[in-house]
Swiss-Prot record:
Function per UniProt: May play a role as a localized scaffold for the assembly of a multiprotein signaling complex and as mediator of the trafficking of its binding partners at specific subcellular location in neurons. Through complex formation with NSG1, GRIA2 and STX12 controls the intracellular fate of AMPAR and the endosomal sorting of the GRIA2 subunit toward recycling and membrane targeting.
One MF term in the entry's GO annotations: beta-catenin binding
Protein name per Swiss-Prot or TrEMBL: Glutamate receptor-interacting protein 1
Main location: cytoplasm
Name of the coding gene: GRIP1
Domain notes: PDZ 6 mediates interaction with the PDZ recognition motif of EFNB1 and EPHB2 and with the C-terminus of PPFIA1 and PPFIA4. PDZ 4 and PDZ 5 mediate interaction with the C-terminus of GRIA2 and GRIA3. PDZ 4, PDZ 5 and PDZ 6 mediate homomultimers. PDZ 7 mediates interaction with PDZ domain of GRASP1. PDZ 7 domain binds CSPG4. PDZ 6 mediates interaction with the C-terminus of liprins-alpha. PDZ 1, PDZ 2 and PDZ 3 mediate interaction with the PDZ-binding motif of FRAS1. PDZ 4 and PDZ 5 mediate interaction with PRLHR.
Cellular-component GO terms for this entry: cytoplasmic vesicle; cytosol; dendrite; endoplasmic reticulum membrane; neuron projection; perikaryon; plasma membrane; postsynaptic density
Protein source organism: Homo sapiens (Human)
Length: 1128
């Protein structure tokens, strides 16, 4: 049994009779009240003696409310034996029972008799100055049985005090130096009513002004000069109960408290073994439950004062706890006993304290214990890469998550000061900025917005080599705890700061702690965009207080990242402290191509998190083990369960990724940087890649005579590592495209050149014909329709051309093409294809196996085909290739012109003058991102997809330029072929489905509601095999039909809201709220429509019905739909 007693009893003072002297020690007052310091009959030893001066003001005819005993005739020095409740002396919060009065208004009392002392105090006047000696408080030592924790308490002054007495402080004699200790809490005062502060607690700071190194008089002055409301940082003791940590069954905990006082425990319910259990949900910081050290979050409450909780509701259990008397007996099952080993037995029986419990697979239900905290959650990614993330607090209705263990204040990070808990820091050691002078900091002001500080490495605390980085954090205030941070500045609040204020305190379970980025010692560079440097600490604190009105603040933080040890290659271990409710900051992914024995990959590291500050982890590093449990053959679920078992420290075994390793230099790889100035024109490069986070981004072709080719430093097959200093590590192709779009006039590319042996097999060395002859199959038909559209509507920062006098330009700003399969080679751990990268003019592209539609819209004189020329892929005979060679040259040149021009003047003119029909038909901007597969067909059986290729090019289409349009175009098989031709077509179609890329068009469409039908003329449905919302039916001649929508179009955005992961229940309200105008971004698979038409119709003209309604899904199955449908 563990009994912890915290008693705070109030002595009831009887009323003094009129003939009783207010300063005389009466018979009833010979015994000091309980809880007071023992009154010594002898002098205090010199080494434990402290002194202070107390000034009291009283009115004429009133008394101080002070009882004095002792005198030269009363066996002892004059001392305070009692303070009357509500008296002047008690309310001053400067005197305590047991203090020795050395002098009164400068008159030494050493030789005064008791009656003379009483007479002096009665007749001293209105101002009374007492010289007081007191016994110094004992020194608190943190050891195996006691640990220190901190808590921030906000108090309101009553008069000019907060209701507690402080002693200690710095002293000339080091042996007498003490922390500023609270020795007494006045009953009924502000501190007592708030309930957190207890005698023996240490006062560390007041409104951010730290008291370390201040004398007792200075500490008293700071308390008097602060405002009516002050934030006090308190350090308190927490008992370490070894018996709890080593217990093997239920425990009986007895806690003594004052009747009516709160234990500081919040309860909740959880389901365990299909039974409801009562567990501890929260423990208030510095409460009785927190200080005793026997109770922890997650403990099961089995009984309260002998009443079993087995069949009690949460409300009943809470009431039982509130009705407890001065002795609370709790039967608990410590939370650490509920953790099962990864391969542990299904049933574990624990018996103690006459109670038997049976547990099975408790981990699956443990998640419901803390629904408002951070957990390790399993989260499949949209691109089929399962990811293990450490997100923010899940909503109450979130799926079951996993509990994370609390962070022990004794656990310390070996990497950075910022990861230390305040309670673990010696009180003589506080963090400071690594750059000591104001001048050096001013030179860095312009760098505050950069993600990485340009300052060189410096020496931080404990001799560590660190570098500083900055990040921006947005906090939303909690109604109870606020933001949960306290700043620390100079000694004087009005002094101009020479360095930014520090975060000196972070409240447990506050927004500041839950964000996982802020740590004690971080420098606050700006608050809501206002720099803190060269302002006063009071101004910085006021900014923070003002933000609490709006419940939101944006902080710019500078923090240290360790550089003492940075592994360059090989395998190493990293230990991360795991705080309760705080994310580690790493995302672990399992690539879709992962095989048994392959490790998991670190795919993201949150900036400013514990993992980031170690300085040793990088994107792409392989995670081999967690707490010595290997992950080679572990699924993501296993990894989640292993992390669940982790205690205060998480030990990760890491293998450095090849691209992060220095060993690549010895393999012949060359890394360099190329800067390109586009001057309004295109770069002339084509990039290829996939949506897998760690697949390489490759330069697949260069425009002949283009900017990139003229540099001579960029070649086909080179890998792009970074764009404008933004690393592409762990980023898919879409992000690389976005970075290039936003790059501006100057584009800096970090290039990795392959080895000489590898570059010998460059795509340029192998003509296309030789590869096609190896395949021994039909040739591909060349078609300019393969050219994808420009993403100018998605990335509006496309640089327009400034050289309108030039007749034509080579290539586009970012022009990517797709090639055929060929011999692959290995470089840096990635498979590349030697034939994947060719110029658009060299490659064979695929055209629709259909007859043309030449239905012309009379109002603009454009054919249907010209307005919506698809990027569909298909196979055609070899004869068609010769027929369209000249045509391809024309279209290639025309589309290149459009690509180079950016948003041309003609387009801008149309945008200004376009009516509704022009907007619907002519102003649609196409953005095509093509996805395909790469396979090796070297006379072997077909293998499954080994790499998901994704390529992109940017093109802006406008059919308003007449010399680019073409009214008729035929790239179809002969319509009069016999059964053999039909069989051959089916065979080619099957080959196409296996080998050809899967094009996906992105369209931006603006629809206007039909005034007669009051709808947009289309219905939507949820995807069957793939998450998403798709167009199901389209009303002929309705807005959707006129706008170019087709069945199986997937809605990616509705009125600029991303709907990729939405279902119909979320999308339909968005469309309903759009009013008369609807902006859509949709993706389309042309092969779906191609296959549908091919199966429905014999060769011949298309019917309007066939062009509007498709009955079959694509071969990938991703466009199948299911009920319910909703007509909009």
């Amino acid at each position: 049994m563990i009994a912890v007693s915290f008693k705070c009893r109030c002595q009831i003072l009887r009323r003094l009779t009129k003939d009783e002297s207010p300063y005389t020690k009466s018979a009833s007052q010979t015994k000091p009240p309980d809880g007071a310091l023992a009154v010594r009959r002898q002098s205090i030893p010199e080494e434990f003696k402290g002194s202070t001066v107390v000034e009291l003001m009283k009115k004429e005819g009133t008394t101080l409310g002070l009882t004095v005993s002792g005198g030269i005739d009363k066996d002892g020095k004059p001392r305070v034996s009692n303070l009357r409740q509500g008296g002047i002396a008690a309310r001053s919060d400067q005197l305590d029972v047991g203090d020795y009065i050395k002098a009164v208004n400068g008159i030494n009392l050493a030789k005064f008799r008791h009656d003379e002392i009483i007479s002096l105090l009665k007749n001293v006047g209105e101002r009374v100055v007492l010289e007081v000696e007191y016994e110094l408080p004992p020194v608190s030592v943190q050891g195996s049985s006691v640990i220190f924790r901190t808590v921030e308490v906000t108090l309101h002054k009553e008069g000019n005090t907060f209701g507690f007495v402080i002693r200690g402080g710095a002293h000339d004699d080091r042996n007498k130096s003490r922390p500023v200790v609270i020795t007494c809490v006045r009953p009924g005062g502000p501190a007592d009513r708030e309930g957190t502060i207890k005698p023996g607690d240490r006062l560390l700071s007041v409104d951010g002004i730290r008291l370390l190194g201040t004398t007792h008089a200075e500490a008293m002055s700071i308390l008097k000069q602060c405002g009516q409301e002050a934030a006090l940082l308190i350090e308190y003791d927490v008992s370490v109960m070894d018996s709890v940590a080593t217990a093997s069954g239920p425990l009986l905990v007895e806690v003594a408290k004052t009747p009516g006082a709160s234990l500081g425990v919040a309860l909740t319910t959880s389901m365990c073994c299909n039974k409801q259990v009562i567990v501890i949900d929260k423990i208030k910081s510095a409460s009785i439950a927190d200080r005793c050290g026997a109770l922890h979050v997650g403990d099961h409450i089995l009984s309260i004062d002998g009443t079993s909780m087995e069949y009690c509701t949460l409300a009943e259990a809470t009431q039982f706890l509130a009705n407890t008397t001065d002795q609370v007996k709790l039967e608990i099952l410590p939370h650490h006993q509920t953790r099962l080993a990864l391969k542990g037995p299904d049933h574990v029986k624990i018996q103690r304290s006459d109670r038997q419990l049976t547990w099975d697979s408790w981990a699956s239900n443990h998640s419901s214990l803390h629904t408002n905290h951070h957990y390790n959650t399993y989260h499949p990614d949209h691109c089929r890469v399962p990811a293990l993330t450490f997100p923010k607090a899940p909503p109450p209705n979130s799926p079951p998550a996993l509990v994370s263990s609390s962070f022990s204040p004794t656990s310390m990070s070996a990497y950075s000061l910022s990861s230390l808990n305040m309670g673990t820091l010696p009180r003589s050691l506080y963090s400071t900025s690594p750059r000591g002078t104001m001048m050096r900091r001013r030179l860095k002001k312009k760098d505050f917005k950069s993600s990485l500080s340009l300052a060189s490495s410096t020496v931080g605390l404990a001799g560590q080599v660190v570098h500083t980085e900055t990040t921006e954090v947005v906090l939303t205030a909690d109604p109870v705890t606020g933001f949960g941070i306290q700043l620390q500045g100079s000694v004087f609040a009005t002094e101009t700061l020479s360095s930014p204020p520090l975060i000196s305190y972070i409240e447990a379970d506050s927004p500041a702690e839950r964000c996982g980025v802020l740590q004690i010692g971080d420098r606050v560079m700006a608050i809501n965009g206002i720099p803190t440097e060269d302002s006063t600490f009071e101004e910085a604190s006021q900014l923070l207080r003002d933000s609490s009105i709006t419940s939101k603040v944006t902080l710019e933080i500078e923090f240290d990242v360790a550089e003492s040890v940075i592994p360059s290659s090989g395998t190493f271990h990293v230990k991360l402290p795991k705080k309760h409710n705080v994310e580690l900051g790493i995302t672990i992914s399992s690539p879709s191509s992962r095989k048994p024995g392959d490790p998991l990959v670190i795919s993201d590291i949150k900036k400013g998190s514990v993992a980031h500050r170690t300085g040793t982890l990088e994107l792409g590093d392989k995670l081999l083990a967690i707490d010595n449990i290997r992950l080679d053959n572990c699924s993501m679920e296993d990894a989640v369960q292993i992390l669940q078992q982790c205690e205060d420290l998480v030990k990760l075994k890491i293998r450095k990724d090849e691209d992060n390793s220095d060993e690549q230099e010895s393999s012949g790889a060359i890394i360099y940087t190329v800067e390109l100035k586009r001057y309004g024109g295109p770069l002339g490069i084509t990039i290829s890649g996939t949506e897998e986070p760690f697949d390489p981004i490759i330069i697949s072709s260069l425009t002949k005579g283009g900017l990139a080719e003229r540099t001579g430093a960029i070649h086909i097959g080179d890998r792009i590592l970074a764009i404008n200093s933004s690393s592409l590590k762990g980023k898919p192709l879409s992000e690389a495209i976005h970075l290039l779009q936003m790059a501006g006039e100057t584009v800096t590319l970090k290039i990795k050149k392959q080895t000489d042996a590898q570059s010998a097999s460059s795509p340029k060395k192998f003509p296309i014909s030789s590869h096609l002859s190896d395949l021994g199959d039909v040739e591909e038909d060349s078609s300019p329709a393969q050219k994808p559209g420009k993403l100018s509507d998605m990335y509006p920062s496309t640089v327009p051309s400034v050289d309108s006098a030039v007749d034509s330009w080579d290539g586009s700003a970012i022009d990517t093409s797709y090639g055929t399969q060929g011999t692959s080679f290995q470089a840096s751990g990635y498979n590349f294809n030697t034939y994947d990268w060719r110029s658009p003019k060299q490659r064979g592209s695929l055209s629709p196996v259909t007859k043309p539609r030449s239905q012309t819209y009379p109002d603009v004189g454009l054919s249907y085909e010209d307005w919506d020329r698809s990027t569909a892929s298909g196979f055609a005979g070899a004869a068609d290739s010769a027929e369209t060679e000249q045509e391809e040259n024309f279209w290639s040149q025309a589309l290149e012109d459009l690509e180079t021009c950016g948003q041309s003047g003609i387009l801008r003119e149309l945008e200004e003058k376009a009516d509704r029909r022009v907007s619907l038909r002519n102003m649609t901007l196409l953005a095509t991102i093509m996805s395909g597969s790469t396979m090796s067909l070297n006379h072997e059986a077909p293998t499954p997809r080994s790499q998901l290729g994704r390529q992109a090019s940017f093109q802006e289409r406008s059919s308003s330029r007449p010399h680019y349009s073409q009214t008729t175009r035929s790239n179809t098989l002969p319509s009069d072929v016999g059964r053999k031709s039909v069989t051959l077509r089916k065979m080619k179609q099957e080959i196409k489905e296996i080998m050809s890329p899967t094009p996906v068009e992105l369209h931006k469409v603006t629809l206007y509601k039909d005034s007669d039908m009051e709808d947009f003329g289309f219905s939507v449905a949820d995807g069957l095999l793939e998450k998403g919302v798709y167009v199901k039916n389209i009303r002929p001649a309705g807005p959707g039909d006129l706008g170019g929508l087709k069945p199986y179009d997937r809605l990616l955005q509705v009125n600029h809201v991303r709907t990729r992961d939405f279902d119909c229940c979320l999308v339909v309200p968005l469309i309903a709220e759009s009013g008369n105008k609807l902006d859509l971004v949709i993706s389309r698979n042309p092969l779906a429509s191609q296959k549908s038409i091919d199966q429905q119709s014999l060769p011949g003209d298309w019917s309007e019905q066939n062009s509007a309604f498709f009955q079959q899904p694509s071969h990938g199955g991703n466009l199948e739909t299911r009920e319910p449908t909703n007509t909009l």
